């Protein structure tokens, strides 16, 4: 199994993701090759909480242009993790 810290890359802090905190849902950018069970185990191991459900989605990178040069931002994968009632992740508490 992969190292859990390699699976969870960073938390997502947007207006939409902070609105989901009221429903006990936390959003993370995860490794492109990680599946739902790996994400669940990584969150449970790192934050010592119980995960009820994991929803994942692949987000395609956007095309960017600087003058005549075109490029693309990297593709990424987001995971919305629903925790058991009463569990919280401390890094999101100040939002």
UniProtKB/Swiss-Prot annotation:
Keywords: Ribonucleoprotein, Ribosomal protein, RNA-binding, rRNA-binding
InterPro entries: Nucleotide-bd_a/b_plait_sf (IPR012677), Ribosomal_uL23-like (IPR013025), Ribosomal_uL23/eL15/eS24_sf (IPR012678), Ribosomal_uL23_CS (IPR001014)
GO cellular component: ribonucleoprotein complex; ribosome
PROSITE patterns documented for this protein: RIBOSOMAL_L23 (PS00050)
Gene Ontology MF: a single term: rRNA binding
Keyword presence, RNA-binding: yes
One BP term from GO: translation
Keyword Acyltransferase: no
Family recorded in the similarity comment: Belongs to the universal ribosomal protein uL23 family.
Assembly notes: Part of the 50S ribosomal subunit. Contacts protein L29, and trigger factor when it is bound to the ribosome.
Protein role: One of the early assembly proteins it binds 23S rRNA. One of the proteins that surrounds the polypeptide exit tunnel on the outside of the ribosome. Forms the main docking site for trigger factor binding to the ribosome.
Protein name according to UniProt: Large ribosomal subunit protein uL23
Organism: Desulforamulus reducens (strain ATCC BAA-1160 / DSM 100696 / MI-1) (Desulfotomaculum reducens)
GN (gene name): rplW
């Amino acid at each position: 199994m992969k190292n859990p810290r390699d699976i969870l890359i960073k938390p997502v802090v947007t207006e939409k993701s902070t609105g989901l905190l009221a429903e006990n849902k936390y959003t993370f950018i995860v490794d492109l090759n990680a599946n739902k069970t790996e994400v669940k185990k990584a969150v449970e191991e790192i934050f010592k909480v119980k995960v009820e459900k994991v929803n994942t989605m692949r987000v395609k990178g956007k095309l960017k242009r600087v003058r005549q040069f075109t490029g693309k931002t990297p593709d990424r994968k987001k995971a919305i993790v629903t925790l058991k009632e009463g569990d919280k992740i401390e890094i999101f508490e100040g939002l």
